[in-house]
Amino acid sequence: MATSAPATWAAEQLRDMLGRCGTATRTAERSDDASPRVVVAGPGSSAVAERLARTGIEVPHGEEAFAIAPDPDLGDVTIVCGGGPRGLVYGVLELADRIEHATQLAPAIPRSPVVGRPSNDVRSVARLFCSDVEDLPWFHDEGFWDRYLTMLATQRFNRFSLTLGLGYNYHRGVTDAYLYFAYPFLLTVPGYDVRVPQLSEDERDRNLAMLKYASDGCAARGLDFQLGLWTHAYAWLDSPDARHTIEGLSPDRHAPYCRDAVEGLLEACPSIGGVTFRIHGESGVPERSWDFWSTVFAGVAGCGRPVGIDLHAKGLDDRTLGDALDTGLPVTVSPKFWAEHMGPPYHQAAIRERERPVREDPSERSEWHRYMAVSEGSRPFTRYGYGDFLREDRPYSIVHRLWAGTQRLLVWGDPATAAGYGRAAALAGSQGLEWCEPLTFKGREGTGIAHGRTGYADRSLEPTDDWDKYAYGYRLVGRLTYDPDAPADQWRRALAGSFGATASAAESALASASRILPLVTVAHHASASNNYFWPEIYTDMPIVWTDDGTRSHPYLDSPEPRRFGTVSPLDPEVFSPVAGYVRELLDGEPDGRMSPLQVAEHLERLADGSVRGIERVEIGPPTADAEVRRWIVDVRILAALGRFFAGKLRSAVWYELHRATGERASLQRAVDHLAAARDAWSDAAERASVYVPDLTFGPEARLRGHWVDRLPAIEADLQDMRDRLREPAAAHGNGVDVAALVDAAERRPVVDITHAPPRGFVPGETLTLSVGVGGEHAARVAGVRVRFRPMNHALAFSTCEMRGTDGEYTAGLPGSELTGEYPVAYAFEVRTDRAACRYPGLGPTLTEQPYIVVRPARGRRGS
């Protein structure tokens, strides 16, 4: 095992790193001299097992486990043992990483055992190809692949997914079609004269060679290679400016060609271990095209080795899933994690109500609806979450895909959030996480700009490779999805070189800044589509509205009337919308969800923490280090965005209160908060001058441009609000003391909750839950409820009132709702006379799971 290709490659990386430190090395199967040595061994070495046992650790078990330990007898000998070739890679690269980031060699060698065990089976990174202008240079660059894949292996990702065909949401209005329908850009298929007339044979062959180079490079490093084929349309609609087209294919030969093409591709690239398919209508194939997909699956099965089939969950129905399972190949379902965005590190308790109910067949409404008959009809709840796929008896794997709609450009890195995602990736026995990397969708839909992938106008800030800017984020996500409880040295060692004595401040600043936009995303979700909602460079949605509508905005999947105050949270079970919160205030019926004012308070706190940390970095000696300068700029922008959204949320609450009560003081507060928000956005725009004026993630104005472009709409909304302040009707209220209502509701009960979650439940039997309520406000508690639901996003939450005496409350969840088909999620709502809170909540760092999951007890079933 120690001589396997991945282990040998890793040993070469260690030798190279030692060589850069000026240390000469040699390799031998045995060595009896007294020089310092690293012994690399698999679990079958009895001598190594005996030595490890004497250090107090066992031989690693599992393909990806490893141990590093000093030899108990020979002080200059370090043992690296892996449970499999991949574990050996991680152990050896851990040594290399410690040496790279150390100032001296000796302290980099661990003097006490280091043990690694994976928490998730799949830790994947998805990189999109969606621009011939911006993506062909890295795709054709062997040096890029060598550096990038080495980084992924070092950070303990175990899968790389090259994603093709996601450049458009639908095959209409196509300009940049390079690798969109990928097969003819990569190979010829015997028996078919399918070709791209604008593509030379040499370039086609080069594309295939690079695909093989990348996939073989993954195998050499112990990485799985996943190929995403997201589009199977071959004729672009209304696309006169398409730079590449497909010839030689007809509807009757479409499915057979795709079958034979995917089989040929897998034969030509034997290191491809899995294929991802987008099944829903945006693939260019109408939903319910069962014969088409069963034919394509046969091509995967025909390649002669067990290649996995990964099915994107949106629009996936039982028959298509069954056809994939019938191949006998490993099948994975990959739902969206937080729609097409990034939220806090937990799975949304509930999806938006808009996507939950089953609808009538929409096929007759339009051509687009015909393509989307399942995801817009019988199974809309599969669009933006785990849907109904978390069945306890599932014969497939689940890997959650974290999309990049929230933050695409600015640097990101928060250890607590990354660790939270590492835990959430295993929800209810799920297999892991696929992370869409930063810069996802850059240059999409024909908007690529030569040499413009990183977006810097200040060229001194450009990294060597585009991913270099985000290396710290890769480190966090990779290592903390491998082990969410990893020690902090795993990431802190990488900061010392650039930040020196201010490394701790830099870590704290970016951690706080990195929680801002995910919180905005879940609390105020103007659109589930990344093609419309981009909070990083937000297209303003107005607070002020009139009888004849509002100012224009792109958020067509938000509730009507479409204004800022009516927008739904992405998790409406945990967060209150602005308008809903105002109704709760006026009705005196708070329900304990996180209010927009609480969100604003958190955003302000995170912004303040970001600024405090980055100011400590700034007061250090002036530096030309590009990483430090990039962090300073981006953290400052993120802090300003936090203050903008805090002000906007506060303004919206007070404006909705004014509209409901007529109170002038509420309107004045709304104006003041929106003015503060405008100033914060202006600050972000000024600090973002290091970026080019047109940052392109799509052709529409909402997907390109710069922060400064968004200011006029923000100022127009502020002016509309000031105009309202001048209206005579605004001077009179209805007598409601609005400020007192807000103050009472925001004084959440201060209680101590004690609860021991059950180890499981018996399907069909009542599940008794108990909770203790103590603390400062325990005497004011008017009641406790439990909110629960089987973990199927198509279902609504149920409420059960708890009975209590002397601070102890109990309730029985009815067995009729606990069938055992799904795990069950629940949380508690504690109420006083005019306020409420939820338990367990998101916690002080906003990174905890706000509900408890209980699964059926194995081997037990009620009558």
Where do the PLM segments sit?
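Catalytic-core regions of glycoside hydrolase
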Residues: 26, 102-103, 158, 170-181, ...
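Short, well-ordered secondary-structure micro-motifs within conserved domains or adaptor modules
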Residues: 26-57
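Glycan-association/targeting regions that enable binding to alpha-glucans and other polysaccharides
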Residues: 722-863
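Feature activates predominantly on carbohydrate-active enzymes
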Residues: 5, 10-13, 17, 60-253, ...
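Aromatic-lined, polymer-binding surfaces characteristic
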Residues: 230-255, 268-273, 280-290, 629-646, ...
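C-terminal non-catalytic alpha-helical accessory regions
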Residues: 437-706, 710
